Each structure stands twice: as structure tokens, then as C-alpha cells.
Amino acid sequence: NRSIPRGTSSGYPSIFFPELSNKKLSYFGSEAEFDFKSLACQNLMAEVFEIISDARVGLRHEHVFVDFPKDELRSCEKADAGLTRLISGAPLAYIIAFRMYFLSFMTAVQNTNTASGVCIGINPHGPNWSEIAREVKRKGGRCVAGDYKAFDAHGHPQLFWALLDCINHWYNDGPENAHIRSVLWLELVNSKHLAGFGEFAGSLVYQWQTGLPSGHPLTSIANSFENLCLLVLCYHDTVGCMYQFWDHVSPYVYGDDNLLAIALCVLSLYNQSTIELAMAGYGFIYTSELKGSEVVPDHRPIEEVGFLKRGFSFCEDLQTWVAPLERKSVLKSLYWCHNSKLKDEIEIQTFDNFVCERSLHGFSGYDDEVSFVYSILRSKRSLDKLSTPVQPWSFGQALLRSRTLEY
């Protein structure tokens, strides 16, 4: 698993201390190797061990999350409606303590993504995509792809506490460590957040009763497992039993997205329509991955569904399944530059990525589209450092192969 990124905020209360204003660099330095000898880092380590020591006897520290608008592209409709999403930043000391007791499990989930069905860590340009497509074909060739409306707002804390029981069973390292995890788990299911307006800004703390904080290290994994549990419960409600789920269904979930390879023998009972009805019983609005008003069939072939905004297409040249990103997402990637100070480097990198992603949509029209984009960037002098001519379709395929091998 990756180390803690040093270029992000260290959270509350560090943000209120000027000497700690340089994000996590204030603790770990900016050199290639982390600096653990600074006074700030030594104090941080002492705080981490105090958190663990108190959790051992059932004492919960006040770990406060700080909410801020997520810096991302949103559709015009969502932007006009003010539907900006929030990031909830976690305190650094808590993140370290949590990783000490949960990181091995998190790594195991990522390393077994398609095998377990929880696809955190999946590489759409690697063999994972073919594994999913082949499993759909093996099950009979029909599948369901779904999503939820306001998934985060309808979470069931009981499912998350049941997940903790499974995690402790996975570790099997004694009641003391299990108890520490149960105290640290409170910040996931009942997180505390900084609030207040006007003269009271930053002076109030309130606690969530449902939903998971987006900046928590385990939020994506926990949401994925809730998604999976709900799909199993719906199978029980529609088919009449639960124990055959893994025989007849191969689920793939990531957060609130899912794709289900369903055996033909249960397809009339467990499909898009019946899952939607069953989900309503648990307080969830389940839709297709398209999220629009478009009506989709109860089940579809793998070539007609999407997962994580990517489709499934068999590439004859590579003799493997590839994951074409939605065309509009491929084009929109060229519209924005996130950091004006690194504009030239970012535009070159974005163009390379565009070439790779566009190649997944086939040869037809590739040369015209890539040449058009290339000419615009050249006219802006963005690609002065790139002296090679516009790359042919075969280059996009070769770039894709290299990304697959590097993973």
C-alpha cells in the first residue's frame, strides 16, 4: 500500500498552528525519505501511541474531520443545483493509528480485487478487465450493471459493524487488538465534524449518525462491502435463499457501482428489475449504471454494460478485453488544466493519455481526432517539447500494452 501523501493537509487541529501549516511536510519533511526525527514528528508519534493506549481501555479521542468542497469537474446541471461534493479530511494522528491496525486488511482487499468481488485496486488496463468479461461469459453471458441514488445518505451502521466483526475474524489476533479496532471504528460509522458559521466558524463539533466520511482511509472499502451485502440480501429476498449466491452470481463492486454476472438458472428471479424492487425494501434507490431516465433491459450482454464509466470491448489486435472510457470523458479530459504552473507538462501528459484512451475506441476516426487535437496544442506551443509527429493508432495500442505491463 502507498505511504501517506505528504502534499495534503494534516487535518484538525494542526491546521490552526502556523508552525504546522506546510501540510504533512511539516511532520515528515520534503526529502525522498521521510524524516521521523523532527520535533513535530516525535510529538505526532507520542499522540498516536496515546490514541492506541486509550483505545485499549475503551477511551475514544475526539478525532474531528474538516469538510471542504471537492475540487473536481461536475456536470453543468449539478453545478447549477449547487451539488458540490464534500471531502472530509481526517486528522493525521488518527490516520496513522488506523493504518497500524487495518492496513494489512486493506492491502489484502486490494490484492484480491476481482477474486473477492470488491474491486478496490482494480487496473482497467490490466488483466482484471478480461477476468471480469470471461466470468460473465462463463456464467452464461448475461449481466446487470447498477448504481444507487444518494448511496452515502442511506448507509446502515449495522452492516458496517458486521464488517468490523469480519475484519477482526480475519486478523484473529486476540481480543485486545479487536477492542482497539472497535474504538477506532467509531470514527468511520459516527464521525465528528467541525462546523459553525460567522463568528462561530470552527467552534462547533457535531457527529454523523449515518454516512461515512469521504476522507477516511477505509470509506471506499466499507462502502463496497455494504454494496456487496445489499446485493446478497436482495438475492435472498428474490430467489429465496442466500447460500447459493456465490454459485450463481459473480459480483464486482466498487463503492456504489456494481456489475453482476448472473447464471441463467436464476436470471428470471434476480435481475435489474427485481433488484430495484428488493433494494427499495432497504431504503435504497437502485438504478442502472446509466443513471438517467433510459429504461434498460433486465439483463444485458457484457458488451452493452459499463463499470466504473468504462465499457467492455474485445480487441482483436491484443486478443484481450479492453476498457474504453466513456467518449465524452475522453474528450473532456482535454478541456481543463488543473495546475497552471505546470501547464505544459500537464498538457503533454494529458495528450498522451488521450491517445491511449482514444485508441480503445477503435481505428475508425482515430487519425482525424488525434491529429486535430495535436494541431491545436501545437498552435498553442504546448507541445514544443514534443518534437515527434502525431502518433498513429498503433502507438496508442503500444502505449496501452506498456501500461498493462507496468502495472
Where are these regions (language model features)?
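Viral RNA-dependent RNA polymerase
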Residues: 1-407
